[in-house]
Regions:
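Conserved alpha/beta-hydrolase "acid-adjacent" motif
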Residues: 448-453
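Catalytic histidine-centered segment of alpha/beta-hydrolase-like enzymes
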Residues: 474-486
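Catalytic histidine neighborhood in serine/cysteine hydrolases
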Residues: 86, 462-477
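Catalytic-loop region of hydrolases
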Residues: 2-7, 21-168, 173-175, 207, ...
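Short beta-strand/loop motif that positions the catalytic acidic residue
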Residues: 435, 440-443
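Alpha/beta-hydrolase fold nucleophile elbow
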Residues: 219-229
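Alpha/beta-hydrolase fold active-site neighborhood
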Residues: 295-436, 481-482, 490, 507, ...
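A catalytic-pocket lid/entrance helix-loop region that shapes and gates access to the active site
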Residues: 153-167, 238-297, 330, 342-354, ...
Length: 539
């Protein structure tokens, strides 16, 4: 039985001090067509990318760079324009084997994308060059992100004020009010800076931007590969532009009916399960880490380490919130486990904080930009509860139920949406008919960020899709990634190469065994480097 931290029943949070902002009313403006009349095809002037990009450094070397002007507001196609930053890795196969363009999205929302073509074109992610060479790979920074203009970044103190933040888990009403005021300030600052832009930052407009890219490239259809949030973007595009999809891979699939408040509640139980799997793995290797022979014993040591930094933050910078952040990636992927287990053992057993210092990084401008777009898109895509009592009740209940690892971290990560200066919109209706878009879904069974139910929901909504399930799979972003699952990679490569997909059957259409968990005693058994294609998005 887990030892749970009791949370107060908040009857007197003092919410009168915290006005909720605009009511979550449905927008009254007329619906905008998928691609309104009057939106003309723009043009892209490609040129070699600089060896050192002002935003992404050396990540774009060897690619072609370009920009595309698109409407800020698609209901006013001749109005204000914004600029999308793009990259391209051109096909190297003979023209008679050319298969068109593939647009790429790593997730988020808020993930940059201009670096992605290199790994797909060169095969460094496991895609055979015999397939990768037949496509033009297109990376793009979505509206507001990284190299696109305007680029958003709001109150930097919300993510990190230069010192340890308050504990994520509020033990008193006063502690909860501190986080609420921080969230309110963040939302207000975004409104002050970008009030005329925020209403146009949403997934439907990013899908329209993708179709504008297609038109500018002169392509009748696109291919697409999206991870995590990129699966929701792909689902939206396929629903808005079903005749424009040639092939589409969606890996680690978002549940569309949950966007976005319910989706985040879904995550809390899923992250708890994944944390338990990590703790059980550490216990299995007690001969290496000495943190306990059971998952519960390891978990107790994890919270013991958190109590130490709560009492005395490391360097005044790493408190319980930052400590939790350091270990959250273990719920996204297995290949961080050896390093993070050592970090935990060093801190709890020996008081050595060097590993925590190395793993903790103060958010840079890209992280601030990514978070600004995460909130801008999520808060605008759909309605969120504007009464904090609902948030408090839901997250307190989940915490009491034993979901202690991420629940309040997740609450505060999304809390600005309770105060966002523009109301949430109406989500795109997702789905296609029996003869709809040609989609391949890839889903790890134990994915925490996008729980497995989302893949089955999208599979039902697109009867023409095929679903490959990685049984026991734990790594968010399972194919063409550091997960290195040859079965999944083979199915995806076959699909991109020739269009072949598994035959349709009830439930999942094909299965792959999970990639084995790491063995810390194997030669050179250190954690694989974190590939930025799989940075935690979709929190």
């Amino acid at each position: 039985m887990k030892k749970l931290i009791a949370l107060p029943v908040v009857a007197g949070l003092g919410l009168a001090l915290l006005p909720a902002g605009p009511a979550a009313a449905r927008p009254t403006a007329p619906a905008v067509p998928a691609m309104p009349a009057g939106v003309t095809a723009g043009s892209i002037a490609w040129k070699p990318c600089p060896d050192t990009d002002p935003v992404l450094g050396g990540l774009l070397k060897g690619l072609e760079c370009g920009t595309l002007a698109v409407p800020l507001d698609y209901s006013r196609p001749h109005g204000k324009k914004i600029r999308l930053a793009l990259t391209r890795a051109r096909h190297t196969a003979p023209d008679n084997r050319y298969q068109g363009v593939v647009l790429l999205n790593r997730g988020g929302p808020g993930g940059y994308g201009r670096d992605l073509p290199t790994r797909f074109a060169t095969g460094s992610n496991g895609l055979p060059t015999s397939v990768g060479s037949t496509y033009d790979w297109i990376g793009f920074d979505p509206r507001g992100v990284a190299g696109s203009e305007p680029k958003l970044a709001c109150d930097p103190s919300y993510l990190y004020p230069g010192k340890a933040r308050p504990d994520y888990v509020p033990r008193t009403a006063a502690q909860e009010r501190v986080w609420l005021r921080k969230a309110q300030r963040y939302a207000a600052d975004c409104g002050r800076r970008y009030g005329d832009v925020l209403k146009h930052i949403n997934t439907k407009n990013v899908a329209r931007d993708m179709d504008a890219i297609r038109r500018a490239l002169g392509q009748p259809k696109i291919n697409y590969f999206g991870y995590s949030y990129g699966t929701y973007l792909g689902s939206v595009y396929a629903s808005m532009f079903p005749k424009r999809v040639r092939r589409m891979v969606l890996d680690s699939v978002v549940r569309p009916s949950g966007v976005w408040y319910e989706a985040n509640l879904d995550q809390n139980a899923a992250f708890e399960k994944r944390a338990d799997i990590f703790f059980a793995w550490v216990a299995r290797w007690d001969s290496v880490y000495h943190l306990g022979r059971t998952a519960r014993a390891v978990e107790a040591n994890y919270y013991k380490g958190m109590a130490k930094v709560r009492k005395a933050p490391i360097d005044g910078k790493i408190g319980p919130a930052e400590y939790n952040d350091v270990f959250v990636p273990n719920a996204y992927r297995n290949y961080t486990w050896p390093d993070h287990a050592k970090v935990l053992a060093d801190w709890v057993l020996r008081g050595d904080a060097s590993g925590l210092r190395a793993q903790f990084g103060e958010p840079d401008w890209l992280a601030q930009n990514s978070y600004a777009i995460y909130t801008a898109v999520g808060c605008r895509d759909a309605a969120w509860p504007r009464n904090w009592k609902r948030w408090h009740a839901d997250h307190s209940r989940q915490h009491r139920q034993g979901n202690t690892f991420l629940t309040w971290n997740n609450a505060w990560y999304n809390a600005p949406c309770a105060f966002w200066p523009v109301p949430g919109g109406t989500p795109q209706k997702i789905g296609g008919g029996k003869h709809g878009p040609n989609i391949l879904l890839v889903q790890p069974e134990n994915d925490a960020a996008t729980p497995v139910g989302g893949a089955f929901e999208v599979h039902r909504l697109f009867p023409s899709s095929r679903l490959v399930l990685e049984r026991g799979g734990n790594n968010h972003g399972a194919s063409l990634s550091p997960n290195r699952n040859a079965c999944l990679n083979g199915i995806v490569a076959g699909y991109l190469g020739t269009g072949v997909r598994p035959a349709s059957r009830k439930g999942a259409d094909a299965f792959c065994k999970a990639t084995p968990a790491p063995d810390p005693t194997a030669p050179a058994a250190t954690s694989a480097p974190v590939d930025p294609v799989l940075l935690p998005g979709l929190r």
